Amino acid sequence: MKGSEEAYLVSDKATKMYSLTKDSEKNHPSKPPLQDEENPQSKYHCHNNNKKAYDARQREQTFAKKKLCIASLICFVFISAEIVGGYIAGSLAVVTDAAHLLVDLSSFFISLCSLWLSSKSSTTRLTFGWHRAEILGALMSVITIWLVTGVLVYLACERLIRPDYTIDGTVMLITSACALGANLVLALILHQSGHGHSHAGGKHEHMASEYKPQTNASIRAAFIHVIGDLFQSISVLISALIIYFKPEYKMADPICTFIFSIFVLITTVTVLRDLLTVLMEGTPRGIHYSDVKQSILAVDGVKSVHSLHLWALTMNQVILSAHIATDIVGESKRILKDVTQNVFARFPFHSVTIQVEPIEDQSPECMFCYEPTQ
């Protein structure tokens, strides 16, 4: 290839910019920035398309922090009320619900810490930054749900085996009704819905793919916590109504705790699957490998695509890397630009890395160039 080979690594807007060259600047004087072939006056930078993704990420984090702070305050107030009410009533179900709220509060703090970490700049050791801290925090929150639910199921079984306890139905009913109201408020605060639209620049665009932005991982984990508590609160209210009208049916307290604990565990399955997909660097839900490949092949001059990888740093920070082969080596710059702009226009990628290669350099026997299995 003519000239020295150069590679550029440019960080996000909030981080420092680095330029790594194979040869030192002493041997090669600084060159003017690359310009568009058709219009020498216009400049094309490889990260021009990342601004929307960066701005969306900043809005997402600010929005998530605000929701988590409000939810934490409300959660703390109702935890205090439930602990006092459950102690007075002698109800395991009420104390169980308070324990769930306490775990929720802890998960909110974990989520806030992970959001703070994920906003830190990248380093030479962590070149992607701390984005995965958000995923790890969400995973920790899900694990705490399983642990606490397991403890509560054990306590419910103990009460079924040894029914030597009394319950104040009136206090239990009042407390459980307040708890249900608290969880409904928390669910409304943490609920998020999104659509695959971009409103940047006053435009209203639709992505060509079926991808829809997923909920922030921290908010999603917190929401799952609250949904679990909502199920638990419903179970407490049901058992409270039974005990209030039929005090001799106090077994309803541990039975409802046991039954609704199963529903709590079921609510974590989907979010746990998505978190593990991110950690395993799997293709994010809603983005199809074949669609991305076809959009690259549709660019004039691209003859083949291999080493195509799709993964995500967080739920909504999707990354693409690929090698493309062309028989028009003289237009490598134009092909690189067209492919990059095409995939950014059709898919919500946070970062795209494309390597252009001459088609005669391809090796059919190369194991790294094989098409992935279904």
Swiss-Prot record:
One of its GO terms (cellular component) is secretory granule membrane. Zn(2+) 3 binds at residues 45, 47, 366, 369. Residues 89-91, 156-169, 244-251 are lumenal, vesicle. Zn(2+) 4 binds at residues 131, 350. PANTHER family: CATION EFFLUX PROTEIN/ ZINC TRANSPORTER (PTHR11562), PROTON-COUPLED ZINC ANTIPORTER SLC30A8 (PTHR11562:SF37). Homodimer. This is Proton-coupled zinc antiporter SLC30A8. It comes from Xenopus tropicalis (Western clawed frog). The gene is slc30a8.
